[in-house]
């Protein structure tokens, strides 16, 4: 079913988040802008943040090691973020939700990731565990937007609305008040608005299709293995080959992934509409008090999503071809963490000033998490030379 034919079948307007209540509150009060909404301004602040720009130098899946040839067409955290933002805009538009809030959350959803992708995050978390701590990229993103982005004369951080800060934390998971008492202002007993719930699924749709593309492009995945292991890909690939028998393999793959993405997005829109209708929910408050999240794929499409994700983990993310990337990320991140813990003088002055309040291990993790792949390589090399 085409999205265009359903644009009038919006969700009840009272379900969409708005900035006129608690969600629009900022830590430091600001006068309203003459032309832009508060959520729109938040999106712009995220877009102009240094941490956002650094996403261009952070790995999505492929980390280019020092002796690797250039690979300019693989996705970075920044290109992935832009793809998630495009999907999220479509979802919000089709469902009649708050597009400005949705876009701000999509732009911010990966801003807390460290270098070297998930391998880097795992290594940083492992380093912190030895000090009774851990690393969570959502919570680190909150630290970035509330403190480390120091761009304004009147306040520290970006002074984002509560709605955006809550969505940054809760778009992909729920947190308990007992485990995270410091997050008390973020309504931990409530579901996030639908705008935030959709970001996690937009993220999955973007990276599933993109990682199949990058895996095939890299040669780690073969077309036949993907066809065998990902049923939804095989179905669409068969239809493309029948329709365009003369198409080159790369063109057929591109068309297949485009159709696969469209099917996932369309299914998500239709399923959210159906779940909201069946639940009888009419307001944002009812969304937030619902017993479970309402943003989900249909059972059949969820099975296809799970199969694709399982295939990627077994054949791509954990493949021998990616093992050297993971090993290098672990060596660099854990090695630099140890080096800075041994010599805190390697920290910039503004980070050292936070050690009494936060503890050395957390500040070292903050510093490393903000690095690009190339910068951490440089610093790691310098630290080894002593």
Predicted regions and their residues:
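Short active-site segment of divalent metal-dependent hydrolases/proteases
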Residues: 108, 112-113, 206
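Histidine-centered, transition-metal-coordinating active-site segments
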Residues: 1-91, 99-100, 120, 134, ...
């Amino acid at each position: 079913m085409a999205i265009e034919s359903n644009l009038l079948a919006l969700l009840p307007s009272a379900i969409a988040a708005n900035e006129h209540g608690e969600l629009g509150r900022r830590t430091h009060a600001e006068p309203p802008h003459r032309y832009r909404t508060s959520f729109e301004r938040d999106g712009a602040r995220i877009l102009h943040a240094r941490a956002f720009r650094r996403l261009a130098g952070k790995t999505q899946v492929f980390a280019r090691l020092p002796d690797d040839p250039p690979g300019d067409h693989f996705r970075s955290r920044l290109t992935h973020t832009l793809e998630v933002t495009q999907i999220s805009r479509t979802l919000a538009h089709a469902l009649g939700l708050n597009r400005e809030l949705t876009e701000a959350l999509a732009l911010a959803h990966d801003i807390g990731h460290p270098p070297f992708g998930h391998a880097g995050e795992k290594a940083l978390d492992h380093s912190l565990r030895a000090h009774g701590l851990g690393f969570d990229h959502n919570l680190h993103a909150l630290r970035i937007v509330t403190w480390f982005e120091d761009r304004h004369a009147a306040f520290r951080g970006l002074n984002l609305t509560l709605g955006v800060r809550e969505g940054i934390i809760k778009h992909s998971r729920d947190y308990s008040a007992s485990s995270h008492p410091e997050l008390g202002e973020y309504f931990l007993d409530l579901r996030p608005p639908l705008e935030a719930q959709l970001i996690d699924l937009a993220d999955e749709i973007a990276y599933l299709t993109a990682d199949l593309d990058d895996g095939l492009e890299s040669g780690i995945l073969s077309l036949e293995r993907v066809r065998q292991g990902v049923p939804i890909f095989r179905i669409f690939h068969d239809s493309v080959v029948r329709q365009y028998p003369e198409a080159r393999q790369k063109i057929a793959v591109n068309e297949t992934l485009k159709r696969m993405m469209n099917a996932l997005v369309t299914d998500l829109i239709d399923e959210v509409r159906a779940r909201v209708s069946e639940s009888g929910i009419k307001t944002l408050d009812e969304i937030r008090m619902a017993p479970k999240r309402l943003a989900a794929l249909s059972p059949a499409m969820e099975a296809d999503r799970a199969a694709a994700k399982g295939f990627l983990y077994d054949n791509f993310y954990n493949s021998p071809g990616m093992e050297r990337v993971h090993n290098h990320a672990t060596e660099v991140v854990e090695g630099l963490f140890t080096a800075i813990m041994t010599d805190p003088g390697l920290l910039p002055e503004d980070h050292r000033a936070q050690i009494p309040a936060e503890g050395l291990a957390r500040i070292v993790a903050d510093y490393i998490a903000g690095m690009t792949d190339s910068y951490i390589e440089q610093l790691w090399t310098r630290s080894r030379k002593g």
